[in-house]
Regions:
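Structural signature of the Rossmann-like NAD(P)-dependent dehydrogenase/reductase core
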Residues: 12, 49-54, 58, 103-109, ...
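Conserved catalytic Lys-bearing alpha helix of Rossmann-like short-chain dehydrogenase/reductases
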Residues: 33-39, 83-91
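C-terminal substrate-binding subdomain of Rossmann-fold SDR/epimerase-dehydratase oxidoreductases
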Residues: 141-143, 148-255
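NAD(P)-dependent short-chain dehydrogenase/reductase
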Residues: 92-147, 153-158, 162
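Conserved Rossmann-fold NAD(P)-dependent oxidoreductase catalytic core, especially the SDR/UDP-sugar
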Residues: 6, 10-12, 30, 37-79
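Conserved catalytic-core motifs of eukaryotic protein kinase domains, centered on the activation segment
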Residues: 19-27, 61-66, 116-117
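NAD(P)H-binding glycine-rich loop region in Rossmannoid oxidoreductase-like domains
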Residues: 1-31
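Short-chain dehydrogenase/reductase
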Residues: 27-29, 66, 72, 77-88, ...
Length: 255
């Protein structure tokens, strides 16, 4: 495909998400790392650039929780996180050893109004909007006070394009940049949605696997390196995202 269509940049998005990967660790490893190695080898042979997303899952319980630095201890305790750290190191290796133009960002939880949740620890932040728009009580799988970074999908797509178009001479870091747009816990998200859907109700029923994963991740990220090195600047905050999510889902669901 790369040869036939003269591809210059490969976006490798294959992964089994965090909670699902814990149920089948080897599948998580094989999908996450197997796909990356294939892409890196193709890029080495044909001279392509490669973008592979990392994640806040690349951090672990010993990582500083608040304003997590760009360069810090990682040591994740999930197979998803292990694949992400491995991916960061492999990508850097292919850059330094073979000159492959590898770049990456550590995505927070991504919130989409198009794609349904798929087994991630942060997926509650998508599911909650569906419940609110449908007029259903939301059962939250995480405890009150569980803060995590999040980002609306339009900003995530911008980040994927912008980093690959950035001037390489300005990139001190490559694999992988902290990026974020907002940080909240379920209660803050619930109260934000209630401003627009006052009858919305939520009940807490934490799921042990998801809660343990969330507890090992940062509360907030320092993304100053991304802002300084390639101009990262998200457009959506929590309120702006919530308005757009609710409007889009109402149209999508006919509510």
């Amino acid at each position: 495909v790369v040869r036939k269509y003269n591809i210059d940049t490969i976006y490798n998005l294959a992964a089994i998400l965090s909670a699902t990967a814990e149920l089948n660790p080897m599948l998580g490893w094989n999908v996450g790392i197997g796909s990356l190695v294939n892409c890196l080898e193709v890029a080495r042979v044909f001279g392509c650039a490669v973008f592979t997303p990392s994640s806040i899952g690349a951090f672990g319980p010993n990582t500083p929780k608040d304003m997590t630095p760009q360069d810090t201890i990682q040591r994740p305790n999930t197979i998803y996180g292990v694949t992400k750290v491995t991916g960061e190191l492999l990508s850097d290796y292919y850059f330094t050893r073979f000159g492959v133009d590898t770049r990456s960002v550590r995505f927070p939880g991504l919130i989409s109004n198009l794609t349904l949740p798929g087994g991630g620890t942060t997926d509650y932040a998508v599911e909650i909007y569906y419940s609110a728009v449908k007029g259903e009580k939301f059962i939250c799988p995480l405890e009150k006070g569980t803060f995590m970074d999040m980002m609306y999908m339009p900003d995530a797509l911008d980040a994927m394009v912008d980093i690959m178009e950035a001037d390489p001479s300005k990139l001190i870091h490559r694999n992988s940049f902290n990026v974020t747009a907002m940080s909240f816990d379920p209660e803050i998200l619930y109260n934000t949605i209630k401003k627009y859907i006052p009858t919305f109700e939520m009940e807490y029923k934490p799921e042990p696997i998801k809660q343990a994963i969330a507890n090992s991740w940062p509360n907030s990220l320092d993304d100053s390196c991304a802002r300084n090195e390639w101009g990262w600047n998200p457009k959506y905050d929590l309120d702006k995202m919530s308005v757009d999510m609710i409007e889009t889902l109402r149209a999508k669901l006919g509510k």
